[in-house]
């Protein structure tokens, strides 16, 4: 079995203009990603500010992306919530719109135990019958999909991947022991650890920074797959990532997507934009990165 994708999937931002979703800016951004070698597009996830999008907005965004991508790369819809039934409903809608797969975050706030996690994920997957990417991000949910639980879930024919945002290589190694990596993909959820994640056998990354440097980030994966040492190639990307860490995702990345004119620099409360000085420093870091490419 082939993996859902290999290399860089982009955790897509949502462009706003005057607090409304700007679908034209969204189309321009998606075209930019497709032209620059993105291998998958993830819609309505954390980076998209999904908690502050209405159901109607999520559906319009997803339909716009699916229609534009037109099967050139997989479109993965974030449909997971901390309510199993609502997650099923959202997943059915994503399937009806033509999503290639869904991404399911662990329940948050009303967090469960590992047995509950299995039942939650299996209930959604059994109902919808679309490929599923599990999303493990304990820093946001205070809930971890333990390696033993990943092993159980990986045996389901529709559960095909894990987005691993633990930034914990011991966790990665323990998961790897328990799954068949020929049929179950491991994607990093942390842009800054991809060099080691790839070296340890990861199949790719679901990336924030690839919103603005998709070609360069995919080239890193391709070089590693060719057997090259990518430490030096990563260094300028690492410098840009350090600048991007000035605040919580997606606050900084939207300072850059707006710089590329994919919507205004707007976020929905409770998120707020960077201070002007931080925005200037971040955009200068991006300019420095791009200038270095052209030397």
Swiss-Prot record:
Known role = Catalyzes the condensation of (S)-aspartate-beta-semialdehyde [(S)-ASA] and pyruvate to 4-hydroxy-tetrahydrodipicolinate (HTPA).
Catalyses which reaction?
Answer: L-aspartate 4-semialdehyde + pyruvate = (2S,4S)-4-hydroxy-2,3,4,5-tetrahydrodipicolinate + H2O + H(+)
Name the Gene3D superfamilies for this protein. Answer: Aldolase class I (3.20.20.70)
The protein's assembly and partners = Homodimer.
Instruction: List the active site.
Output: 135, 163
- The EC number of this protein is 4.3.3.7
Q: What is its main location?
A: cytoplasm
Q: Which organism is it from?
A: Staphylococcus aureus (strain JH9)
Positions of pyruvate binding: 47, 206
Q: Which GO terms describe its cellular component?
A: cytosol
On whether Signal is a keyword of this UniProt record, the answer is no
According to UniProt, the name of this protein is 4-hydroxy-tetrahydrodipicolinate synthase
């Amino acid at each position: 079995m082939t993996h859902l994708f290999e290399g860089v999937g982009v955790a897509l931002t949502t462009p706003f203009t005057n607090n409304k979703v700007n679908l034209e800016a969204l189309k321009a951004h998606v075209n930019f990603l497709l032209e620059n070698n993105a291998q998958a597009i993830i819609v309505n996830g954390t980076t998209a500010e999904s908690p502050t999008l209405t159901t109607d907005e999520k559906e319009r965004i997803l339909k716009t992306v699916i229609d534009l991508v037109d099967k050139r790369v997989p479109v993965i819809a974030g449909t997971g919530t901390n309510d199993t039934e609502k997650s099923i409903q959202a997943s059915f809608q994503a399937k009806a719109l033509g999503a290639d797969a869904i991404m399911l975050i662990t329940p948050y706030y009303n967090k469960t135990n590992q047995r509950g996690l299995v039942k939650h994920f299996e209930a959604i997957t059994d109902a919808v019958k679309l490929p599923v990417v599990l999303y493990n991000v304990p820093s946001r949910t205070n809930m971890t999909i333990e390696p033993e639980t990943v092993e159980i879930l990986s045996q389901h024919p529709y559960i095909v991947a894990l987005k691993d945002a633990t930034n914990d290589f011991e966790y990665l190694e323990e998961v790897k022991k328990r799954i068949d990596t020929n049929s179950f993909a491991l994607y990093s959820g942390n842009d800054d650890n991809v060099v080691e994640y790839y070296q340890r056998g990861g199949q790719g990354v679901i990336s924030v920074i690839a919103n603005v440097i998709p070609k360069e980030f995919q080239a890193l994966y391709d070089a590693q797959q060719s057997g090259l040492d990518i430490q030096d190639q990563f260094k300028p990307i690492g410098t840009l990532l350090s600048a991007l860490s000035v605040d919580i995702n997606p606050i900084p990345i939207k300072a850059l997507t707006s710089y590329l004119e994919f919507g205004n620099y707007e976020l929905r409360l409770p998120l707020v934009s960077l201070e002007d000085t931080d925005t200037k420093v971040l955009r200068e870091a991006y300019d420095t990165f791009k200038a270095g490419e052209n030397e």
